[in-house]
A protein has these predicted regions:
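Polybasic, low-complexity RNA-engagement segments
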Residues: 1-160
Length: 160
């Protein structure tokens, strides 16, 4: 549904709520999602697709998963962060090369320097002079916990 008032299924996130969440949590401008349609498939699994296709066919999967909403704290997905995280202006932790390599490999690490919000963050590193999102981290009590799924974990070269 476009807005909460148009909701047909109790608890289902509206387009407005999804866009607002990305703006409030990560500072991603609403215009970023201008041509993006959102679908909920499964319990709170939000999919994004860069078009709007009218179809009589029941949708089973379309686009990429970007958010999980049927829990106390909404959680961005790795694919969502990789797609929209470059536009983020808040709650992005920039990792040094060795930290980025450990994070991408799925390792948790102590990082006491973060002074922003606790909770889900976008972990990023510098690649070719640009900030590149690696994935989702959960920051609690001075520890950055990698939430990179096993299928996305990789070994990054540590460049100086």
């Amino acid at each position: 549904p476009a807005t909460p008032a148009e909701r047909e299924v109790e608890g289902r996130a509206s387009r407005e709520e999804v866009v607002d969440w990305w703006q409030e949590r990560f500072g991603v401008a609403p215009e970023t999602f201008e041509n993006v349609t959102f679908w909920e498939k499964g319990s709170g699994k939000i999919w994004a697709f860069n078009a709007d296709l009218p179809s009589p066919v029941r949708v089973e999967g379309l686009g990429i998963t970007v958010l999980r909403t049927r829990q106390e704290h909404w959680k961005p997905t790795t694919t969502g962060v990789k797609r929209f995280g470059r536009e983020a202006t808040t709650n992005v932790i920039e990792l040094e090369p060795a930290e980025a390599a450990a994070f991408a490999a799925g390792h948790d690490q102590q990082l006491d320097r973060w002074d922003g919000d606790w909770g889900y963050l976008i972990a990023a590193h510098e690649l070719a002079g640009e900030r590149e999102p690696i994935g989702v981290g959960l920051y609690l009590h001075g520890e950055l916990r990698s939430r990179v799924p096993k299928g996305y974990q990789e070994e990054l070269a540590v460049l100086k």
